[in-house]
Amino acid sequence: MMPHPAIAIVAPNTLASVGLADIIHRMMPGAEICLFSHFAELNQAENRDAFFHYFVSAAEVLTGASFFLQRQHKTIVLTHGE
């Protein structure tokens, strides 16, 4: 049996993160979704390299630029606009 994919959401906006987590959960019911408010929280996590994808706010990508640059094929930058 394959392990469930793990998805990290790194964004300071809790409401947006929970909403995105719900959308992802509906598309991938078996996925493990972890929410982090800031890059520092993700960086301290023991499983920080185990994620299949990282959904990250633009500000947090800049904070952890070297981390996300090494994982650019897994990183999806979240932006907001009108």
Please annotate each region the language model reported.
Residues 1-82:
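N-terminal regulatory/sensing modules of transcriptional regulators
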